[in-house]
Amino acid sequence: MDAATLYQQLFSAAHRLFALEGEGVIRELAVEAWVGREAISALFEWRIVAVSANADIALDSLMGQRTTLLTTLAGGGQSRRTGLIRQAEKLGADGSLARYRLTVIPWLWLTTQQHHSQVFQNRTLDSIIEAVLQDYAPYAHWRYAAGAEARIAAFGERDHIAQFRETDYQFLSRLLAEAGLGYTVAEDDEAPFGHAVVFFADSAQLPEDPESAAGGGIRYHRAHSQESADAIQQLICETRAAVGGVAVSAWDPEAKRAIRGHAPARYGVFSGRAVSPDPYFSVSLSLAPDTTSAQRVAEQVMEAIEVRALVFTGSGSVRTLRSGTRLTVTDCPHLPPQPDDTAGYPLLLDAVEHCG
């Protein structure tokens, strides 16, 4: 048996937990290990170490290629993570095998590579997003989650907004933050490069993790080869001091008046534990030209404070976890009680670090 045949048998996707899918020489690579990090409103990055019997793969041929990291699940299905190869490195050779390291990123990373200075007048947020991202065709593919377009409509037109020596990514991140929008990256079979950017206004509209949805939640349980499903092994709850409300004010020099907004804490568990007076923020008139806009800004700031008042950190063996998805944790005795004792505890995955 020659080395190539032995390699194909040992590193066949049928015998491996992880595999790479792609065109050309990507098919010759077998995953040895990988790590990655992803988060809401941030660019993910996977670093994949792969081996191949071909020690002469041209690294330039891998740049910009679409690749999908396949993960075999406990039930026999597969989880997909798709991106573009940003960097390819040859780490050396060991006997008849060569090692390569691939860095995989979403298409939105391309927006970090260009700086522009331009002005938009009397434009809605979605039209500005389209104007900025259309330069990244054919890679660019995005959509809006339920409720995002209504938030954009409520935000209205911007009379004047400037991008000055910013990357397109910095500019878009600033606009989304002002409008109270976030984004996440999701798999999309209709996208030309297998993944899409999803803009959202309400995290409750984001999809549930497939393992959590199929099993009625994910158990807080041990990790063992005899278990039939993945589980969460550690979960730590961290609480922070909250405030009872937020006040916002903008000064209109022509009308000689202050435009104000105030948002109280929405959740009693936080408002009852407030330990300081309501914080006061002075904002630009362009951000709060009227009372409605000032109220919207106050509510967004209050949401940002409340979302950080109760944070969970944990670890587990659940192979489907992605940032920007929701899950329900069951059988965890130290989580806050729910009105329904049989219901699990709902969580939103903000950031996920992977190792495989």
Question: What spans do the regions from the language model cover?
Answer:
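Amphipathic alpha-helical and helix-coil boundary elements used as assembly
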Residues: 1-356
